[in-house]
């Protein structure tokens, strides 16, 4: 499968009271990958929300991945995204199988990306590229890093960190395969605006 386009990431606080409606609005606009990201300890709610997302993703033909929780991903039969503090990638690959999508956070490090590739990652994620609401203290990444990664890492490259429709085009031009977006997508005031933004992000890959 080709990993290229909009990579939507949920935020349970940002989407409070409109979780499934705004996610479905994004899916209507076109989402390549949807990541369920919830850092709470409410395992029951996380399972219910993830199950709801899986049903939506199946309806729209979108791949669902879970942030930081390989066991929940295995329970649902979906992929996982692992940060640098979430444990090694190899056990997750063994748990989820060869076909599962597994992503790895690499911050601004080509070495981490090459290590992730050697351990069986499906894609690598660099960032933050701009000021991030979700992770304001994350290491800064650059367009030069993106170009170097494009030459050295033979995997799809996701970019994250403060990405909006106003600043995303240069990232695609310099080799990004996936635009990972939270607030720039789900911060919209209406479901219709979420759909419009999703379509606009995807249009950047068509030009």
Curated annotation (Swiss-Prot):
It catalyses: 2-[(2R,5Z)-2-carboxy-4-methylthiazol-5(2H)-ylidene]ethyl phosphate + 4-amino-2-methyl-5-(diphosphooxymethyl)pyrimidine + 2 H(+) = thiamine phosphate + CO2 + diphosphate; 2-(2-carboxy-4-methylthiazol-5-yl)ethyl phosphate + 4-amino-2-methyl-5-(diphosphooxymethyl)pyrimidine + 2 H(+) = thiamine phosphate + CO2 + diphosphate; 4-methyl-5-(2-phosphooxyethyl)-thiazole + 4-amino-2-methyl-5-(diphosphooxymethyl)pyrimidine + H(+) = thiamine phosphate + diphosphate. It comes from the Bacteria. GO terms for biological process: thiamine biosynthetic process; thiamine diphosphate biosynthetic process. Its EC number is 2.5.1.3. One of its GO terms (cellular component) is cytoplasm. Disulfide bonds: none annotated. 2-[(2R,5Z)-2-carboxy-4-methylthiazol-5(2H)-ylidene]ethyl phosphate binds at residues 132-134, 162. Pfam families: TMP-TENI. Its cofactor is Mg(2+). 4-amino-2-methyl-5-(diphosphooxymethyl)pyrimidine binds at residues 35-39, 67, 105, 135. GO terms for molecular function: magnesium ion binding; thiamine-phosphate diphosphorylase activity. Belongs to the thiamine-phosphate synthase family. PANTHER family: THIAMINE-PHOSPHATE PYROPHOSPHORYLASE, THIAMINE-PHOSPHATE SYNTHASE. This is Thiamine-phosphate synthase. The lineage of its organism: Bacteria, Pseudomonadati, Pseudomonadota, Gammaproteobacteria, Pseudomonadales. The gene is thiE.
